[in-house]
């Protein structure tokens, strides 16, 4: 079975409570976000392709909704509150600001999503937190696991 875990929801799966919160800022956009209706789109794209500068194209490889909005964050807080901020597992795409700084120093910039997850980290009680945005496999602290290509049995 494949489940789409919606942002800010608490799911009970196999007797375990799981808080899910997707979303993250794209880090590979130093060349910018291109608009297909820009009269200079082809010229800009060609220049970026020649210089191997990473970029995204709005509505093709980048969407504004990659970050949660305030309504989704509030929904997550409300759902965690309904469970006394206690779940077995947290599954997110990115991680908290403090964990992100530990992983990448100043390379990754904090944003409203990592700050929101910092709040969750400070208030929620959980056994393990799984996230994968940073394309690596490693344990961060005892409770946070950066997962990319691995499959881990949780119980």
Describe the predicted segments one by one:
Residues 7-9, 23, 149-152:
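Residues that form or immediately flank small-molecule/cofactor binding pockets and catalytic motifs
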Residues 7, 21, 92-93, 131-133:
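Short His-Asn-centered micro-motif
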Residues 11, 25, 135:
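Short, flexible micro-motifs
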Residues 10-20, 89, 141-145:
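Beta-strand-turn-beta hairpins that frame and shape the catalytic cleft
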Residues 1-6:
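Glycine/small-residue-rich loop that forms an oxyanion/phosphate-binding "nest" at active or ligand-binding sites
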Residues 16-108:
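Active-site-proximal loop/helix segment associated with metal-binding centers of metalloenzymes
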Residues 95-155:
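Conserved beta-sheet core of the metallophosphoesterase superfamily
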Residues 8-9, 76-81, 117-120, 136:
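Short, flexible, glycine/charge-rich loop motifs used to bind or transfer phosphoryl groups or to couple energy/partner
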